[in-house]
Amino acid sequence: GKQLFKQINCTGCHKSELTTGYSPISPLSFKTFSPYTDLLLHDMGAGLDDGYTEGSAKTFEWKTPALWGIGLSENSQGGNYFLMHDGRARSIEEAIIMHGGEAINSKNAFQNLSETDKNALLKFIKSL
């Protein structure tokens, strides 16, 4: 699953590792962690355009959410997923399929995977 995550370029936005910069609090300086995000705004396409702007973000731009802990969110939300910026996706697979804009190639690559590979990728994402 992890290799498929890289292969279809989910890592283009969902970076596996980030490193903190300098902090006067020494234990926080230059620490590497794995949030699976780049914390940046990305064009997610017309399908996720909700007509609202926030700060400098256009109506179709969304900050990449961290994927760490996503597998736990189903259990913490009464057995349901509420994914994407407005909770409209009810499964990880549905959230992937809603990707557009900058992520359209990753979405298409996901849809072209075999069922076995899709399941392996989804299992990996749930393990984060």
What are these regions (language model features)?
Residues 2-128:
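Electron-transfer interface patches adjacent to heme c in soluble/periplasmic c-type cytochromes
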